[in-house]
Design a protein with these regions (language model features):
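N-terminal Sec-pathway targeting helices
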Residues: 1-11
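Mitochondrial intermembrane space
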Residues: 14-147
Length: 147
């Protein structure tokens, strides 16, 4: 009986330590949206100190979009410890083959109808500033530079 109690106690302590280890790591809020009119958006936000803060950042960012764009589909919204591919390139400021809205704390890649994507990118950057962002700019494909 004592051995069973010791084993249970060790499992509980191990579970608590594992939870705090995961909860206290830093995470990047990333998400992908697709719209009915052919646009795809990949968003990367600045690193958050905890998983809860990361999830809250994704929710704060996506809630107004989902409210205004009923035809938009959230492909994913997750918290990543490490980035790769397009998301890593956005974070690092590497040139990418799509338009990107750059604002403090946010990089948003846009792909869509070629005849309209530039105008939409510039409009989105202007809307972010109107909405309270300190600055935002549309960066054209292949022209991003590392900070």
């Amino acid at each position: 009986m004592k051995q069973a109690l010791v084993i249970v106690a060790l499992l509980v302590v191990g579970s608590v330590l594992a939870y705090y280890h995961v909860a206290n790591q830093s995470y990047f809020p990333v998400s992908k949206l697709a719209s009915a009119d052919g646009y795809t958006f990949h968003m990367v936000q600045d690193r958050r100190a905890q998983r809860n803060a990361c999830a809250e950042a994704n929710n704060r960012f996506l809630a107004p979009i989902k409210a205004r764009c009923l035809q938009c589909d959230v492909v994913y919204a997750r918290c990543e410890r490490e980035l790769q591919g397009l998301e890593l390139a956005l974070l690092m400021g590497d040139p990418v083959p799509v338009h990107v809205v750059v604002s403090p704390g946010l990089r948003l890649a846009m792909d869509g109808p070629k005849e309209r994507v530039r105008r939409e990118c510039e409009q989105l950057a202007a809307d972010l500033v109107k909405g309270g962002a300190p600055s935002a700019a549309c960066v054209f494909p292949g022209t991003m530079r590392r900070p």
